[in-house]
Amino acid sequence: SKIPKQNIHFTHAELGPDRASTHYEDVLKSVGDFDIVLLSIGEDGHTASLFPSHFYDENKSVVVECNSPKYPKNRISMSYSRFNQSRYVFKVISGHTKKDAVDLWLKGGSLPIGKINGNFERVYICKDALPLCI
């Protein structure tokens, strides 16, 4: 089945971080909580443009990242608190280059993916992304 267009909510990064975050904040206010969020993890441990060891204002639904260690430098994302209002959070991780990040996360390391759980969380890790210790 097709997902209706009105149920898909993109950020508009081309507006620049300030205007894009204001626009997305308005979008999020109009749609309420998400039923489903699908996430993965980057080789460096980032998730949804939220990076390890970076501070994000949890009083807002949308956060701006102006010093991303990966291109592009400027990004916007939902805050941890906004993600956690979601009903279901699915974490799907694949790729051998993710092994170190997955290992750190599974050992309790402070990574963004561990801070997003929603009301119900499901985790799927493909064999190629699993560390050898498992």
What are these regions (language model features)?
Residues 1-134:
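Conserved phosphate- and dinucleotide-binding cores of soluble alpha/beta proteins
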